Amino acid sequence: MMSRVLRWTVAVFLASLPPTGLAAEPGLITMPSKYSVEVTIQRFEAAIRAKSDQGWMVFTELDHAAAAEKNGLKLPARTVIFFGNPRGGTPSMQKSPTLAIDVPLKALVWQDDQGKVWLTFNSGAYLQDYVYPRHGLPSNPAAATAFDEFLKQVAEQATE
């Protein structure tokens, strides 16, 4: 249990550091994965699908590296997983249709120039403090905390 708490603390700290020399953006949580890009994606999606009884689902993936290759360009692995919970998102979109531009939620599995694999996603606080208000929706700190706990579990299942 203590190692999970420590790992999460380190992940949040790492979110504040630039993993490839670029400035890290606030609200992003980046965790190292001990697996390949493909396996990390599979494990992340399996962890989301395991919560389907609670409404969670994986919608699709977007492989940026494959798109680059089709256009004669090279890009290290960069796959975005679109996922969400219509039970939570739909009522918010009913109140503010423009929220649909920012949801479903996304997670990025990527490989840096040294071959290290990372999982990056938005924090609950970022979603509640910036995304929701941008669409005229109230912030909900309790929802942000619950979302962070949910994603902590999913991310650990994908990366450990």
Question: Which functions belong to the PLM regions below?
Answer:
Residues 106-137:
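Beta-strand/loop substructures that line and gate deep hydrophobic ligand-binding cavities in soluble
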Residues 13-16:
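Repetitive helical segments and hydrophobic/amphipathic motifs
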Residues 125-160:
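C-terminal partner/receptor-binding element of secreted or periplasmic proteins
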Residues 45, 49-51, 59-105:
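Compact, glycine-rich, soluble single-domain proteins
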Residues 40, 44, 64, 143, ...:
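Stable alpha-helical elements in mature extracytoplasmic
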Residues 1-9:
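Bacterial N-terminal signal peptides that target proteins for export
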Residues 18-20:
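N-terminal signal peptide c-region/cleavage motif recognized by signal peptidases
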Residues 22-55, 160:
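Terminal, regulation- and interaction-focused segments at domain boundaries
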